[in-house]
Curated annotation (Swiss-Prot):
E.C. designation(s): 4.2.3.3
Protein name: Methylglyoxal synthase
Task of the protein: Catalyzes the formation of methylglyoxal from dihydroxyacetone phosphate.
First-level EC class: lyase
Active site positions: D69
Family per similarity comment: Belongs to the methylglyoxal synthase family.
Residue span(s) of domain MGS-like: 4-148
Organism field: Leptospira interrogans serogroup Icterohaemorrhagiae serovar Lai (strain 56601)
GO BP terms: methylglyoxal biosynthetic process
GO cellular component annotations of the record: cytosol
Length: 148
């Protein structure tokens, strides 16, 4: 196990499937004051929409189906993102479903909190840990991965 310090100013990635974008934008508007104190990231379309609707700066990766989910997964693996807010659509098949599953796996692997709906996002943002430095524990999977 390894302890990693998560800074008080969080690096938060905001993602939403098409049918959930409006819900995510409304959630960001509700929590604009808190979110304005953190660094925001997003997939291409979602990030642009949030930035336009809230006037918050959002660094944008590619659109999810064009590789944005994979870019975000890489940033999580590199320790460059702290929180994932991903309002995904459970009723619509996505062309990049394997990428979404990989992103979920990487978030769990690196112990990055992920909210997949508004209720979980509300609990997360209202946590006292949200605005403080936080020590997270990373499990060592090196011994679990078979080496060739």
């Amino acid at each position: 196990m390894k302890e990693v310090s998560v800074p008080a100013i969080k690096r938060i990635v905001l993602i939403a499937h098409d049918n959930r974008k409006e819900d995510l934008v409304n959630w960001v508007k509700t929590h604009r004051e808190i979110l304005s104190k953190h660094q925001l990231y997003g997939t291409g379309t979602t990030g642009k929409l949030i930035s336009e609707e809230t006037e918050l700066p959002v660094y944008r990766f590619l659109s999810g189906p064009l590789g944005g989910d994979q870019q975000i997964g890489a940033k999580i693996a590199e320790g460059d993102l702290d929180i994932v807010i991903f309002f995904w659509d459970p009723l619509t098949a996505q062309p990049h479903d394997p990428d979404v599953k990989a992103l979920l796996r990487i978030a769990v692997l690196y112990n990055v909190p992920m909210a997949c709906n508004r209720s979980t996002a509300d609990y997360m943002i209202s946590s006292p840990q949200f605005t403080k430095t936080y020590k997270k524990i990373l499990l060592s999977y090196n011994t679990k991965v078979k080496k060739d």
